[in-house]
Amino acid sequence: MGDSDDEYDRRRRDKFRRERSDYDRSREREDRRRDDWNDRRPSAREWDRGRERRSRGEYRDYDRGRRERFSPPRHDMSPQQKRMRRDWDDHGGDPYHGGYDLGYGGGGGPSYAPPQPWGHPDMHLMQPHHGIPIQARLGNIHDMDLGPPPPVMKTFKEFLISLDDSVDETESVKRYNEYKIDFRRQQMQDFFLAHKDEEWFRSKYHPDEAGRRKAEAHSALQNRLGVYMYLMDNNWFESVSLDIERAPQITKILDAAVIKMEGGAENDLRILEQPSEEEEERERLSSGGTPSEPSKRDEPKPADTENKPSEEKDKMEEGEESAEKDGEKASAGGSEGEEKTEKEAPAEPIPEPKKLSKKRKRKHSGDSEDEASASESESDSDSDSNSHCSEKPSEREREPEEVEEKEEEEEEEGEAADGKEQTDEQTEREKEKEKKVKDDQPPRPRPLHRTCSLFMRSIAPTISKAEIVALCRRYPGFMRVCLSEPQPERRFFRRCWVTFDRGVNIKEICWNLQNIRLRDCELAPGVNRDLARRVRNVNGITQHKQVLRNDIKLAAKLIHALDDREKLWSQKPREETPTLELPAQNPILKNITDYLIEEVSAEEEELLGSAGGGDSEDGSKEGNPTEITVERDEKLVKVLDRLLFYLRIVHSIDYYNTCEYPSEDEMPNRCGIIHVRGPIPPNRITLREVSDWQKTFEEKMGPLFSVKENLSEDEAAKMGRKDPEQEVEKFVVANTQELGKDKWLCPLSGKKFKGPEFVRKHILNKHGDKIEEVKKEVVFFNNFLMDAKRPCIPEMKPPPHPGPGQGVLSPGGLPFPPQGPQGLMGFGQPRPPLMGYGGGPPYPPNQYGGGRGNYDNFRGQGGYPGKPRNSRVMRGDPRNIIEYRDLDAPDDVDFF
């Protein structure tokens, strides 16, 4: 189908449009833009076609004031290429150009990168969108209400511009330091006011809620300590070492600890001796499939049903009971919906016997009706044959027969009633016996160490934990909710785990929660998978005797620091703790110094001769480390493993992974992962490898030793620490209003007084709750201020302008612009990830108040990724740079 005449004329007019002056006709073209040609052509080939024209005039609209130099191309080397349509002029509705026309400082421009030549144009939308507004998902970033951008601290150069010329250098430095302190103080106060009503912030710094949270954490720690002492007293750690070969035994110990933490008894620990759920499923499927076949084979024929109705009923009742038991087992042991369908599959043919029984009952009743009709017909025939007899004798004969039949029926009914009474008594006796047997048997162990859980990626900071608990408590098997620490780079959104009992249908619960919103925040839950590898290994060099001794020293030091911080052994134990008597010092640290002292045979070496030892020492000093074999000391291994189990179970610290698992008591798996020693290296190791391992490991362990840092008094005063008495005085003055001469008002109660001193006395006496709130608010703010690691908005630093040589891609380098920092939109709006090659850069940093969108920044970073090196836009300066190059030379860089 050809284009219309108007379209053909327009194309003829535009044929030589490049030779016209952009400066003269730029405004006319703004009014006479092309139609949206994206609808007329396949979108999948849009960027491929545009790739050919990127080498010359793609960025012309970003500098409309300039005039380009056009010269006729040379055709002796290659034929003339067809000039493509400029379908990128109209940016309406295009997410890449949506924020281009924003004013200076208006929203920071679009966040998406320019079109990548290797990806689909819609690929930028393929990203997790949990918690991101719908405008961001549709590409209209400039329509999002992200609030005002946070202020950016001025550089010293920018600050000097605002100063008078008469200010000398020392004074300017002094004023700039004051400006920085004022800026940080104001930023901190704004952050406090913005987040002080959010649950995560109050639970961290508010005096009431922080104290409650600390008490809960301490009680949970005491519970964990009691579990560890129970396991140690019952010799659970005796025959187990933290080696990767003992992974099943290590997992069993962790599961036993979880069962005890959940309040399990001795009987519940027996479930660890039973086969796992997978083995039970196989056995259940095999046992469920075999009995179903004989039941089908042994189905009685219709002729037999008349003879054996009672036996068939008994069989049917037994089958229904077994089906119910199988269904209960399946519901108790299943974890996922797919598994449940497999488990319930053997129970599907069960309704068929019910239908058969109904048909058989109908058949029985039909047979009785046929018999009755047959007897009636027989009686009719008899009456017809005996019609010659008189009617009176027949009536006389019928009367005694009817009386006899009634008597027989009454006798049968009495016998049936007696039989029913006897059967009822028997069933009651059987039930009582079964109850006694059940009471005598121990209760079935519960799988307290296995759970099902849902994961919610983005929970808004305004949503409290109580709201999620109230929402999920409606579903059976609900246990607990865990919310992670807020992520400043993601607008302080939190991740959430909701834990349920193992016997629930977790996929059904997940489906029911799919479309539920809390305060305009989509929960978007997903089923959380079980942990794949709970026991993971590190380098086998950790089995060396020297490394083991160093690990004992570090672990003992860490245990001592954590116990002192949490005051586990210094105070008297509470009544509710499982361990009634706790010694003043941790028993596992007793005589620990005996294993930290290294024993050497120096005298023996001296007597036998120091030649060999001297040579080895000289060799090590010269930088030629000697190779040694890994020596394992079982005594050191046993002592170290006891310490590492203590760290993992009590303090939730994975020693070999050098990390702490926060909020583990609220997570679905309370003792999920542990890292252990790997197999012994097959080759010999060097002393340098041992020393390097110890050095790097100690550096990684450093953050675990660090105590909570607080600001000094001087720094706190500079940052604006508040005094409770002064704040109370300000509160009283603010609530003392003068209405007129000798008329003063207390706005809190509406009462009037003759003087301000009476209002003050009234507030202090009658509004003590308000005064306490003011004091708590002061403590709240000071707690936040004194935290040296307090949360804050991520500081946005402008990227450094590239030098003249940084914009040009070298032939030997990567065909990508330099790596830019992962910037944020608005208040921590997450940046979409790059959907291209793995080695490519992220999208360019989006600055607050970014002028004409984000393209000027990107031009300063080397143009589009994969753009040929003859591009003219690899600079940050908007002015043209005159360059001299051979126009006939082919492009020497072809990335695709």
From Swiss-Prot:
Biased composition (Basic and acidic residues): 8-77, 294-329, 337-355, 389-399, 417-443
Subcellular localization, as worded in the UniProt entry: Nucleus, Nucleoplasm; Cytoplasm
Ligase among keywords: no
Compositionally biased spans, kind Acidic residues: 368-383, 400-416
Residue ranges, annotated region (Disordered): 1-92, 268-450, 607-628, 850-877
InterPro entries xrefs: Nucleotide-bd_a/b_plait_sf (IPR012677), SE/Ars2 (IPR039727), SERRATE/Ars2_C (IPR007042), SERRATE/Ars2_N (IPR021933)
GO cellular component: cytoplasm; nuclear body; nucleoplasm
A GO BP entry: primary miRNA processing
Main location: nucleus
Entry superkingdom: Eukaryota
Keyword Cytoplasm in annotation: yes
Keywords: Activator, Cytoplasm, Nucleus, RNA-mediated gene silencing, Transcription, Transcription regulation
Subunit structure and binding partners: Interacts ncbp1/cbp80.
Family: Belongs to the ARS2 family.
Functional summary from the UniProt entry: Acts as a mediator between the cap-binding complex (CBC) and the primary microRNAs (miRNAs) processing machinery during cell proliferation. Contributes to the stability and delivery of capped primary miRNA transcripts to the primary miRNA processing complex, thereby playing a role in RNA-mediated gene silencing (RNAi) by miRNAs. Independently of its activity on miRNAs, necessary and sufficient to promote neural stem cell self-renewal. Does so by directly binding SOX2 promoter and positively regulating its transcription.
Name listed for the protein in its UniProt record: Serrate RNA effector molecule homolog
